[in-house]
């Protein structure tokens, strides 16, 4: 049996058996039965079928073979797998038998780029049967029988097949619509001074001096001296100045409302672009982002104009205060105060509307930025997946669909009676010298053209680089020309 450290067959009746223990897991162990050949791969005719969830093509159809030599020692052989078999961190040569011992480390395949370890790592060990049995991986024939039983009992309903489904409009859209509806309500002048408590950050700090009193709820005005009398001409002059101020506020209010309508239209456009961004329309996203920036600039300009009008209003108030000094009429004072109070209420209503519009616009910009980031991440993920699929497809073409004679992808694939496939031109040239299969050396009795294999190769080549396509076209033309001569 060799040295004590060699990996030799255990006696299950004695309570101990040899197995490949899955590193870091209490399941998926592979039992090595005495006198049995153990094959591992992703195909159907193996002892243990391993199907990678991360990379389906990591494990070949018949990846490796484990069996005993005449002395009873277990060995492992790489059966020409794509990603190789590793014994103690060293890759094995294909079709060469290696002895394995207690504590040896076996790795099937290679780690992915973002992983440190491979998905299938095992350690050669001998354990008690009671310890091994709960952790064993089911054999392929057992899994087939189990799947047949489940398939006869399985019934799906529409409710089971229907997932949570696509949700309705996004929370972001409903939230923005809610804010827009709130800000779109008509502004009513209230005597209690219910105005925005937080002015815009871009406004002049002087405006805070006009903030309503928190205790009384009424606006606080600069000191107005008591007036006892006024001439009719002076009263008319002061009234016309107040009317002009009110007119200016009304014009500003109409501009703000127009700007809000533009923001609502832009919001609808953003939601429409959201659907287009899912299809990869990045140009439309960039254009919409530029339009949003232009709208923000327009809002800032309107805010600056409003600040200038407020300063002009303060100047008007000071001038009216100077005119009112020394005037002695109670009725004129009362009328003027009412007009000034109304003007200030409209001013604060305008400021509140401006703040709401600013918040709505900032919410739209934040939502758009978030959507752009998500779109970029999804595009990068899709590109990475596409490159991975092309890489795997190229590996499959190179390892499974190449002619062993010319080392090119099959051109007019022909399958012999021994089930090996070659190019039609290559096997015809070979048969001029020998009437036997180049791989298994069996006599060639029949040849069958495989149209399915040709169509599959042509479709897969269409997804490869232009160099591969051009080379294949040149080879097809050369072989057709040689066939004519």
From Swiss-Prot:
E.C. no: 2.3.2.27
Keyword ATP-binding tagged: no
Modified residues (Phosphoserine): 157
PTM: Autoubiquitinated through 'Lys-48' and 'Lys-63' of ubiquitin. 'Lys-63' polyubiquitination is mediated by UBE2N. 'Lys-29'-type polyubiquitination is also observed, but it doesn't require its own functional RING-type zinc finger.
ZnF (RING-type) intervals: 403-441
Keywords, in A-Z order: Cell cycle, Cell division, Chromatin regulator, Chromosome, Cytoplasm, DNA damage, DNA repair, Host-virus interaction, Metal-binding, Mitosis, Nucleus, Phosphoprotein, Telomere, Transferase, Ubl conjugation, Ubl conjugation pathway, Zinc, Zinc-finger
Pathway note: Protein modification; protein ubiquitination
Gene Ontology annotations of biological process type: cell division; DNA damage response; DNA repair-dependent chromatin remodeling; double-strand break repair; double-strand break repair via nonhomologous end joining; epigenetic regulation of gene expression; interstrand cross-link repair; isotype switching
Expression sites by tissue: Ubiquitous. In fetal tissues, highest expression in brain, thymus and liver. In adult tissues, highest levels in brain and testis, lowest levels in peripheral blood cells.
Catalytic activities: S-ubiquitinyl-[E2 ubiquitin-conjugating enzyme]-L-cysteine + [acceptor protein]-L-lysine = [E2 ubiquitin-conjugating enzyme]-L-cysteine + N(6)-ubiquitinyl-[acceptor protein]-L-lysine
Domain FHA: residue ranges: 38-92
Main localization category: nucleus
Region Disordered, annotated ranges: 181-220
UniProt keyword Iron-sulfur present: no
Pfam family, one: FHA
Record function comment: E3 ubiquitin-protein ligase that plays a key role in DNA damage signaling via 2 distinct roles: by mediating the 'Lys-63'-linked ubiquitination of histones H2A and H2AX and promoting the recruitment of DNA repair proteins at double-strand breaks (DSBs) sites, and by catalyzing 'Lys-48'-linked ubiquitination to remove target proteins from DNA damage sites.
Domains as described in the record: The FHA domain specifically recognizes and binds ATM-phosphorylated MDC1 and 'Thr-4827' phosphorylated HERC2. This domain is required for proper recruitment to DNA damage sites after UV irradiation, ionizing radiation, or treatment with an alkylating agent.
Protein name, entry field: E3 ubiquitin-protein ligase RNF8
Source organism (scientific name): Homo sapiens
